[in-house]
Amino acid sequence: MRYLVDTCVLSELRKKRPNPAVVSWLQRHFDGNDFFISATTIAEILHGIRKLNPEDPRRKPLTEWLEGDIIEKYGDSILPFDMNAAKKWGEIMAEADSAGHPRPPLDAQIVAIALAHNLVIVTRNVSDMNFAGVKVVNPFSK
């Protein structure tokens, strides 16, 4: 299987004591060729960093983590919101709106990228991502 790792999973791994279930799941499933990150996830993380006060002591290490540990190491595995994903996004947003269940645009972008590349989303936020037929797995649950 091929996986699209969501923001909450990447953030969990940065903790001093990451959730043991997440670490165990990743150890069992990680193969560098089968794990991807969406450009939307990069944007979400960068947004969180930039919201911090420039003097906040967390800002510099978070920026270094994002630019070095994520973008530099996994740059080839970062998937853009490209034309195929944009078409999927338009379809799933229209379907969700028509059904009376509008979806947050960024979550829908991640779902669209996963669908465009036939990926399983790895997230804690299953209810936020479990729509439009995308497969979702929660590594936080045992």
Feature annotation, model-predicted:
Residues 1, 111-142:
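Acidic, PIN/NYN-like endoribonuclease modules and their adjacent C-terminal/linker elements
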Residues 1-40, 50-67, 142:
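Short, well-structured N-terminal submotif of metal-dependent ribonuclease cores
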Residues 12-13, 48, 89, 132, ...:
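Residues that scaffold the ATP/ADP-binding catalytic core of kinase and kinase-like folds
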